[in-house]
Curated annotation (Swiss-Prot):
Superkingdom to which the source organism belongs: Bacteria
Protein's gene: ihfB
Family named by the database record: Belongs to the bacterial histone-like protein family.
CDD domains xrefs: IHF_B
Protein name according to UniProt: Integration host factor subunit beta
Species annotation: Pectobacterium atrosepticum (strain SCRI 1043 / ATCC BAA-672)
Signal peptide span: none
């Protein structure tokens, strides 16, 4: 599901709220989540999961076109850990 599909679905379920308001709310929520992670804080949504930053150590990679070795710096990357409720709901396909 893309962001625009999410907005469409929410707007369809909440017909009393204009689609533009739904779009602005979704965009603001995602912006707040990104800002929180950028500040190094963790986000926890009970029953859904948690977002945090994980450190990736420096390593030697390869340029896929040339095959040359490239030094990659360490960096923090976003990480999502699903909550038990979400894992259980998703497990119907497993």
């Amino acid at each position: 599901m893309t962001k625009s599909e999410l907005i469409e679905r929410l707007a369809g379920q909440q017909s009393h709220i204009p689609a533009k308001v739904v779009e602005d709310a979704v965009k603001e929520m995602l912006e707040q989540m990104a800002s929180t992670l950028a500040e190094g804080d963790r986000i926890e949504i009970r029953g859904f999961g948690s977002f945090s930053l994980h450190y990736r150590a420096p390593r030697v990679g390869r340029n896929p076109k040339t095959g040359d070795k490239v030094e990659l710096e360490g960096k923090y990357v976003p990480h999502f850990k699903p909550g038990k409720e979400l894992r259980d709901r998703a497990n119907i396909y497993g």
